[in-house]
């Protein structure tokens, strides 16, 4: 027979972690990582501390639909909405990766009401590093 717990039937409300307070960050950076499979939008303050983030997979897209420009647009809109709630007005955009959602994400950040001050491509280019995946034969 299982032991009875010492607390009995009285239930107490415990707070699960501290509530996230709103940061007031007027300027920031948007890092768009666009791969062949997904698009991740992370919005940070100028020091690189994460304010909010969103991705195509987080917004309910699964499988090959995550890699579409529409999924990247929805992810960027979601991240921009959260950033505006935290008081953000201007952003610099850093784009990384070869994916389909690059331009769509930048456009939807602008459409959501954030002023884009600069767009920089920070895609890493190997100096003959790892062997790339083999070509697909369909």
UniProtKB/Swiss-Prot annotation:
- The family this protein is said to belong to: Belongs to the universal ribosomal protein uS11 family.
Outline the segment boundaries, as ranges, of region: Disordered: 1-37
> Residue spans with biased composition (Basic residues)?
13-22
Gene3D superfamilies referenced in this protein's UniProt entry, alphabetically:
Ribosomal protein S11
What is the annotated role of this protein in its UniProt record?
A: Located on the platform of the 30S subunit, it bridges several disparate RNA helices of the 16S rRNA. Forms part of the Shine-Dalgarno cleft in the 70S ribosome.
Annotated InterPro entries: Ribosomal_uS11 (IPR001971), Ribosomal_uS11_bac-type (IPR019981), Ribosomal_uS11_CS (IPR018102), Ribosomal_uS11_sf (IPR036967)
Polar residues compositional bias, start-end: 1-12
Name of the featured protein: Small ribosomal subunit protein uS11
Q: Which GO terms describe its biological process?
A: translation
| Annotated source species | Roseiflexus castenholzii (strain DSM 13941 / HLO8)
Q: Which GO terms describe its molecular function?
A: rRNA binding; structural constituent of ribosome
Keywords, comma-separated and alphabetical: Ribonucleoprotein, Ribosomal protein, RNA-binding, rRNA-binding
Query: Its GO CC terms?
Result: ribonucleoprotein complex; ribosome
Q: How does it assemble?
A: Part of the 30S ribosomal subunit. Interacts with proteins S7 and S18. Binds to IF-3.
């Amino acid at each position: 027979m299982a032991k009875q717990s010492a607390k009995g039937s009285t239930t107490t409300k415990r707070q699960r972690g501290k509530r996230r307070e709103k940061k007031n960050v007027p300027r920031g950076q948007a890092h768009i990582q666009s791969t062949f499979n997904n698009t991740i939008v992370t919005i940070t303050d100028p020091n690189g501390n994460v304010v909010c983030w969103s991705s195509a997979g987080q917004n309910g897209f699964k499988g090959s639909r995550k890699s579409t420009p529409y999924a990247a647009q929805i992810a960027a809109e979601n991240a921009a909405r959260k950033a505006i709630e935290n008081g953000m007005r201007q952003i610099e955009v850093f784009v990384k990766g070869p994916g389909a959602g690059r331009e769509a994400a930048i456009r939807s950040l602008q459409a959501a009401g954030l002023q884009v001050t600069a767009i920089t491509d920070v895609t890493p280019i190997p100096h003959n590093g790892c062997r790339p995946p083999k070509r697909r034969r369909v």
